[in-house]
UniProtKB/Swiss-Prot annotation:
EC number: 5.3.1.17
This protein's UniProt keywords: Isomerase, Metal-binding, Plasmid, Zinc
Cofactor binding note: Binds 1 zinc ion per subunit.
Cofactors that this protein relies on: Zn(2+)
Name of protein: 4-deoxy-L-threo-5-hexosulose-uronate ketol-isomerase 2
Cysteines paired by S-S bonds: none
Annotated positions binding Zn(2+): 200, 202, 207, 249
Any one GO MF annotation of this record: zinc ion binding
Enzyme class, spelled out: isomerase
Reaction(s) this enzyme catalyzes, per UniProt: 5-dehydro-4-deoxy-D-glucuronate = 3-deoxy-D-glycero-2,5-hexodiulosonate
Described function: Catalyzes the isomerization of 5-dehydro-4-deoxy-D-glucuronate to 3-deoxy-D-glycero-2,5-hexodiulosonate.
Amino acid sequence: MTASHIDYTIRYAVDPAAAARMDTDALRANFHIGDLFRQGRISLTYSHYDRMIVGGAMPVDKPLALETIRPTGTARFLERRELIAVNIGGPGRIEMNGESFRLEPRDMAYAGMGEDVTFSSEDPAVPAKFYLLSAPAHQALPRRHIRIGDAKRLDLGSAATSNERSIFQFIHPEGVKTCQLVVGMTQLAPGSVWNTMPCHVHDRRMEAYLYFDLDDSARVLHLMGEPSETRHIVMAREEAVLSPPWSIHSGCGTANYAFIWAMAGDNIDYTDVEMVPMETLR
């Protein structure tokens, strides 16, 4: 039985031909994830793309335990999984098997297979918002806390191409070890609005984006689909989107923003992508 403070939905895999025939409502029903952060609750979306779970936990006046859900088929949530939690709210804490870590805004924690996890906020008036990413694991790896200042930083793009940005790699082959999760954050500079353009696909990994750090009235037009058959989904702040392995994943905002990207699949090689020539986009 699912705990009373946890809600979950299931998203099945969609092939590119079916996605090309979808209208706006169908695209959003299959790929868009909203309502992630609700006070006192954990909201989870179980995706059949590489069995990735995308979710949000927003503890307020009491801790929230990450308990199992039916789709995992296990007695404990992380019995055969690993987890990454990124805090995009006020200061909070994550407890893993009795060890507590304080997460400032934009800090990350990794929980390996077999851990029991609980989330809490330091100040109920400014609650933490933990963005959750979980994928199947084959071995237990050490729990870790990575501060945003300790992440591997790359400054790329330019104002001339409207894509000046800083990339923060939380998980990478030279850093924290995971079974298959790869997670990072990109912050666009003021005046820059484009992400991941020129675009690419990676058939061996799915990806999920969480857009945040933008005003309530701002939007990001997230581009998806096969390069020759693109579609868009309009994204508001603190909303996520699933990207199948066959799909591009790019976006353009009405103002600058930040987003958290996460991948799972056959490998953790950032360079294992197929670039899409601009002239083939339609």
